[in-house]
Amino acid sequence: MLPSISINNTSAAYPESINENNNDEINGLVQEFKNLFNGKEGISTCIKHLLELIKNAIRVNDDPYRSNINNPSVTYIDIGSNDTDHITIGIDNQEPIELPANYKDKELVRTIINDNIVEKTHDINNKEMIFSALKEIYDGDPGFIFDKISHKLRHTVTEFDESGKSEPTDLFTWYGKDKKGDSLAIVIKNKNGNDYLSLGYYDQDDYHIQRGIRINGDSLTQYCSENARSASAWFESSKAIMAESFATGSDHQVVNELNGERLREPNEVFKRLGRAIRYNFQVDDAKFRRDNVKEIISTLFANKVDVDHPENKYKDFKNLEDKVEKRLQNRQTKYQNEINQLSALGVNFDDI
């Protein structure tokens, strides 16, 4: 299913530069869009090309609402899908428009979003460090973010203050619900000169971090090359980049503060941090499964539910409970090992 994306659009109208039936030209735009993520173009330019790609990938020839996508007065566009036959487009506060789109078209748009936004930031060096941790968490499969947790993606490029002046705000926000309904978010922001990336669980107002691991941004800045910094005006305008990776355990809440001199091997730190987060997620998942098995056993037998061959059923569920318990202990051991290794590298963990 195509994830929902929302875009603040403050640019002028887009030219009708692509023949909708010409796959070569569409592929050319796809490649051009990919090339923008090399640290030399601003995110606003990338978003304009993304809109152009989506507009043409839908391939609707006679829909009168299509012109609204190119209207320079439009400031907000929401693109999503709830079924296999349509893509919905909401413009400002208007009722959403439904446009027919086949599965292949929608997969094209989804692929572009997945490959070129989730895994890209302005600064190539910084991107490689930050997202190596995210890839480690999801076993190298960035599609896990979309397919296993949520299908919601949101982009916000600019916001306006009371005087009408625009300024960068959330450059990229993906948010959604995990399988147990907790709010999870990945955020890249630029606020008051501080840029940061975060991955973690948020409380109900979707703003405050509920639990996780924090890394001081000054520790990362020094590892970004001068070439990468000079290539991006957005990066130069900021004094530091913060990267926050948050553990996903239901009972785990730690803050990791790094001073610059401690982060001698940033890639090793991020790799171990990624593994620790993944193992902690698996610990939480194993606890969930264990509790579920215990609940089944309690329901079937403590309440004397009438089942065929209750002794065999009880034995089966007890065996399953033992397996889940062993998996839980195994993941807890692996998680603790990664935390110990991180501590040996100079990472300080303080429970809060």
UniProtKB/Swiss-Prot annotation:
Its main location: secreted. The keyword Signal does not apply. One of its GO terms (cellular component) is extracellular region. The keyword Phosphoprotein does not apply. It comes from the Bacteria. Induction: Member of the type 3 secretion system (T3SS) regulon. Expressed at low levels and only when the T3SS is active, in a MxiE-dependent manner. Expression requires MxiE, IgpC and a MxiE box. Keywords: Secreted. It is found in: Secreted. Belongs to the IcaT/YfdF family. May contribute to pathogenesis, although some of its characteristics suggest it is a fossil gene. This is Invasion chromosome antigen T.
